[in-house]
């Protein structure tokens, strides 16, 4: 009698086209391990990512706006979930491997810093050799999670996590789906958040966006997703049509000009570099202040690497707690 995993693998042979990746044909893991009887290898990757500490910490990491007051702004976690849903929809329609797509999407931002891209820019300036969140995401799943053992994900998932950023050599079509879904998600939900914050008003976006993509968030996402599916249906690459590509590029340029570089939205970012550098430098000069796991990394790979790993994994709130603990005098009472 076959097990549930084998049944699912047989189903994939019917549901996944020749352009997709079959779980049964996976290149395997860094460390071989027995198969699960219930789940395919990519389904196990999904579960490992969702249950890891780095994934949970995304709920307290900035998406765009630093320390927003309000319950409905996106965080790095809600962004990740939106990317995963968009990517899975596209993958299903194109008969690619939905589970691999979802695993890549859920893991793609695990290495993101506190304070969003402002934090990434700060660590890129601080750490010798530079800091890139997609490389750190791979390091999280390979080296930092599970007390240094890593999650031991499938190679297809690992490569997809590394390759989710524009300009990085492609891996699978599933990885390409995540790469585009990431962009679809962030330009749309960041516009929604910018309107909520009063930085933009409804209708401020260029006319080409409203004409070709739609007015509401759901309309824009549906227009782009539908176009990607129709354009990519018979291709070995994931693309948008020329008309939608033009509109999305105008959309992206508009967001960079009016939101991502807006002095109101970015007014507090100048403080981020000083805070992160102060914490990082303190750990470099005082390795004994690092947790034991990171002191072990310092022994193997150097204190600068260990300090970067630790600081990049912090949430926005924890960074401030650490900063106050390290640098702000504590109140005391004379008895």
Stretches with model-predicted labels:
Residues 99-103, 114-131, 196-200:
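Post-HEXXH active-site segment of zinc metalloproteases
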Residues 106-107, 124-125, 296:
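Conserved short loop/turn motifs at secondary-structure junctions
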Residues 111-115, 185:
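Short active-site segment of divalent metal-dependent hydrolases/proteases
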Residues 102-107, 180-181:
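Short alpha-helix carrying the canonical HExxH Zn2+-binding catalytic motif
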């Amino acid at each position: 009698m076959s097990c549930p995993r084998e049944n699912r693998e047989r189903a994939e042979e019917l549901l996944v086209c020749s352009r997709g990746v079959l779980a049964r044909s996976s290149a395997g893991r860094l460390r071989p391990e027995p198969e699960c009887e219930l789940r395919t290898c990519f389904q196990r990757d999904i579960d490992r990512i969702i249950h890891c500490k780095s994934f949970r910490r995304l709920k307290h990491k900035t998406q765009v706006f630093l320390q927003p007051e309000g319950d409905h702004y996106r965080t790095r976690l809600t962004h990740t979930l939106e990317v995963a849903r968009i990517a899975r929809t596209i993958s299903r329609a194109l008969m690619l491997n939905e589970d691999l797509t979802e695993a890549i999407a859920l893991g793609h931002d695990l290495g993101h810093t506190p304070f969003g891209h402002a934090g990434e820019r700060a660590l890129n300036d601080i750490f010798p050799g530079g800091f890139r969140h997609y490389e750190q995401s791979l390091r999280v799943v390979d080296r930092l999670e599970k007390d240094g053992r890593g999650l031991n994900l499938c190679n297809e998932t690992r490569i997809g996590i590394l390759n989710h950023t524009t300009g990085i050599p492609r891996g699978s079509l599933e990885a390409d789906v995540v790469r585009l879904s990431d962009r679809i998600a962030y330009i749309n939900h960041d516009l929604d958040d910018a309107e909520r914050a009063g930085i933009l008003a409804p209708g401020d976006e260029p006319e080409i966006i409203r004409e070709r993509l739609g007015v509401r968030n759901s309309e824009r996402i549906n227009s782009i997703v539908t176009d990607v599916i129709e354009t990519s249906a018979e291709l070995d690459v994931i693309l948008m049509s020329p008309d939608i590509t033009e509109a999305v590029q105008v959309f992206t340029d508009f967001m960079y000009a009016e939101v991502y570089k807006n002095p109101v939205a970015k007014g507090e970012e100048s403080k981020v570099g000083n805070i992160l550098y102060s914490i990082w430098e303190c750990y470099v000069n005082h390795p004994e202040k690092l947790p034991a796991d990171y002191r072990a990394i310092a022994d193997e790979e150097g204190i600068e690497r260990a300090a970067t790993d630790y600081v990049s994994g912090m949430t926005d709130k924890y960074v401030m707690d650490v900063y106050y603990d390290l640098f702000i005098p504590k109140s005391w009472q004379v008895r």
